[in-house]
Regions:
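Receiver (REC) domain active-site loop signature in two-component systems and cognate sites
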Residues: 61
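Charged docking surfaces used in two-component/phosphorelay signaling
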Residues: 21-29
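Alpha4 helix (beta4-alpha4-beta5 surface) of REC/receiver domains from two-component response regulators
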Residues: 68, 81, 90-109, 115, ...
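Active-site residues of response regulator receiver
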Residues: 58
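Conserved phosphotransfer cores of two-component systems
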Residues: 48-50, 73-82, 102
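Acidic catalytic/metal-coordinating carboxylates
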Residues: 38-42, 65-71
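Non-catalytic signal-transmission and effector/linker regions of two-component phosphorelay proteins
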Residues: 1-9, 113-138
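Short hydrophobic/Thr-rich beta-strand motif most characteristic of the beta2 strand and flanking loop
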Residues: 31-38, 46
Length: 138
């Protein structure tokens, strides 16, 4: 959980640069501090350098896919798992269904509703976005 007054940090992992940047821009606009990574290898390097309140990862990526990233986080940064979610366009791929059922983390299927993304990020981070807090006078 983020200390009061500090912006929640989010890591967006997606090999589709346009999608990663769109999500980052939308979350930044809501008051989150957002970094992006194009694959699981870069994401692991970012996690070694900085603490993140939420990690959003695509499933299908080159180098290290979402499944591999999840397993590496499980081994190296298990505290992050309760703040992890998938964003994916692979709802039709049965290869991942058993894995997703096993790990029991939130999954948003592309295209997704941005309000649902905001709700899940807020829920996982345990922090109210700075933009919303400023409006409510918190």
């Amino acid at each position: 959980m983020t200390p009061q007054g500090e912006r929640a940090r989010v890591l967006v992992v997606d090999d589709e640069k346009v999608i990663a940047q769109l999500i980052a821009d939308m979350l930044s606009g809501e008051g989150y501090d957002v970094d992006t990574a194009p694959d699981g290898v870069v994401a692991l390097a970012r996690l070694a350098e900085r603490r993140y309140d939420v990690v959003l990862s695509d499933l299908r990526m080159p180098e290290l896919d979402g499944l591999g990233l999840f397993r590496e986080i499980e081994a190296r940064h298990p505290e992050v798992l309760r703040r992890f979610m998938f964003i994916t366009g692979t709802s039709e791929h049965t290869d991942y269904h058993g894995f997703i059922d096993e790990v029991r983390v939130p999954v948003l299927t592309k295209p997704f509703d941005m309000m649902e993304l905001f709700r899940l990020v807020q829920e996982l981070s345990g922090a109210q976005p700075v933009a919303t807090a400023a409006l409510s006078g918190a």
